[in-house]
């Protein structure tokens, strides 16, 4: 094993830090707020009363979340090397923001938050029915991230130090300027830049900005629903996840340093990995239904596990194995949480 100093700040994430407000709800609640399971959306006005209703009607848990932050925390947990990961995003100056800072720091992540004076820390309603989750994000302060924060010397130093970057697609709606700086830096310095399709609405309504950064993506993550939405939006006329994964991996690249690898998870079905015009499928670890708590954070955990081995320059097979291990741990718990130490080798 290389000395831990080689891993100092090796992985940097940027995204929307959100406090998950998670509860097992009922179908009636989903219908009332027009919520579909296995989806992720931004809150509209009609959703705003939902958060209070959740806490008054159901048994609510508050868990530090946000897609990229989840993945970075899981990577940090898998690596067990202090300071291997860093993260930037925007929180409010309030108790939720403080709680988030405490949580991420306790997880061993080097967080450099932008603290917004006017907006409260963002929240994400996590509605669980039958173990499946739906996410309704009220970004608030997370939406206020400014590229000026990234440009500050102490923050840009994190970009310089990192060799791998992960940004969830959700951040495209917040600070494309920041994504541009980081992706161009990665390309110019032969570093590895990775993103996630993240949600159908990103592929559909933020198609142009997503396409702008696709050439920079060395790894593209997503799930089967997002992949099919991506295919439809691009007029590919195929629902076949393997074909879609190949097509995504063959889209133009900004540099020839790395070939693009596309990694699509499909819940309990095998993980599809496309590179070089070929597809490989990797089975996930089966889990009996009664052990499933909820799928919140499953995709994030997969990416975290995957990245934890990628930074060690392990094979794709090892990376997928670690991703499957991490998501298997997380779906047996509420939210994107994990025990003290991983049991992965």
Swiss-Prot record:
The active site is at 300. Its EC number is 2.7.1.20. Widely expressed. Its main location: cytoplasm. It catalyses: adenosine + ATP = AMP + ADP + H(+). GO terms for cellular component: cytoplasm; cytosol; plasma membrane. It is found in: Cytoplasm. GO terms for molecular function: adenosine kinase activity; ATP binding; copper ion binding; kinase binding. This is Adenosine kinase 2. It comes from Arabidopsis thaliana.
